[in-house]
Design a protein with these regions (language model features):
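Eukaryotic scaffold repeat domains enriched in small/polar residues
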Residues: 24-330
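Bacterial N-terminal signal peptides that target proteins for export
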Residues: 1-13
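Bacterial N-terminal signal peptides
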Residues: 10-22
């Protein structure tokens, strides 16, 4: 809880994972989803417990080979190839207290998964082998209390956001032996948080925080100095309703996933809105309480469309030669 309180379908592309292609041709920029940036949508999954199906997916990540990892409410991590074909899965070690939420790629190519209810961070190989686990429960500096998101810098430093017991952002040194930055405080002012749900690093090392219950994005430099904020509660352009995640590409474009408005807002490096994608619904290109975002090396955007029990892949219009993802692993 917060403290304050006509789209044409193409043929199926894969087997049991249910990948569907949505053609785009009648919206702004010639796009049926109303996007000048993305040309089409691929729908991965659907409700179910079998391979390639999901129960409320809440986190998504992409590795160096553009394979996709999805975490859902069953506590599974499922891996798909870049075309959405199911490859493998593994189960989190414990789910009795609560389910995992929050994923990233670390500097060694491992998949990082956050367990809020266990106050710990896990690093898995792309095949699902647990290689590292860290975090000590508590409110003190260097401890973790209900962590929600993680971002890993190129040098291995880890940014972690927490909420509920303590509203906080910490930057852990690469070896986790010390905390280099702690920003702590519940509230609505700069450097204060109300359920920070998503984190992303840009190419310059600046950190973007989806401050969900404050309905805004805050931006800090790598040392925790406040740079700016944008947003505010609402449904107009430039306003947000419970932004649960944010991603930044090499051009500085920001992609903000709004749980409340069931849409993705795209902004430029100056925080000006470029376009708004989606809206509530179950058709391809529409969302129902999306939770998480990920970008691949071609600039394609993955959306964990939670209440529709699927992941949507928005295919970028630009050829790969014109777009390169940031070297940051997030």
């Amino acid at each position: 809880r917060c403290r304050t309180t006509r789209l044409r379908l193409g043929q199926a592309l894969a087997l049991g994972c249910g990948v569907l292609l949505a053609g785009c041709g009648d919206g702004p920029g010639g796009d049926g989803i109303g996007s000048a940036i993305f040309s089409e949508v691929r729908v991965i999954g659907g409700r179910g417990n079998g391979p390639g199906r999901f129960v409320k997916p809440r986190s998504v990540a992409v590795d160096r080979d553009d394979n996709v990892y999805v975490c859902d409410m069953t506590g599974r991590i499922q891996k798909f190839d870049p075309d959405g074909n199911y490859l493998l899965q593994w189960q989190m070690p414990e789910i009795e207290r609560g389910r995992p939420k929050g994923m990233a790629l670390d500097h060694e190519g491992n998949i990082v998964v956050v367990e809020p209810h266990y106050s710990r961070i896990n690093h898995f190989t792309p095949e699902g082998k647990l290689v590292s686990q860290w975090g000590v429960h508590g409110r003190e500096k260097g401890q973790l209390s209900f962590p929600r998101a993680v971002a890993i810098a190129p040098d291995g430093a880890a940014y972690v956001s927490e909420f509920q017991v303590v509203e906080r952002l910490q930057k852990f040194a690469p070896a986790r032996e010390s905390v280099q930055v702690e920003i702590r405080g519940a509230g609505h002012g700069p450097r204060e948080f109300n359920r920070a749900e998503g984190l992303s690093l840009d190419d310059a090392g600046n950190l973007y925080v989806a401050d969900s219950c404050n309905h805004r994005v805050q931006v800090f430099d790598g040392d925790g100095a406040f740079l700016r904020e944008h947003g505010g509660p609402g449904a107009a352009r430039g306003e947000f309703s419970y932004p649960y995640d944010v991603r930044v590409d090499e051009q500085g474009r920001q992609y903000v996933c709004e749980f409340g408005n069931s849409r993705v807002t795209v902004l430029d490096a100056d925080d000006q809105v470029l376009e708004v994608i989606g809206g509530a619904g179950s058709a391809p290109g529409r969302f129902n309480n999306p939770w998480s975002l990920a970008l691949d090396s071609r600039g394609n955007l993955y959306v964990a469309d939670s209440q529709n029990h699927r992941v949507q892949k928005l295919i970028r219009r630009e050829p790969a030669s014109e777009f390169q993802l940031s070297s940051s692993p997030n």
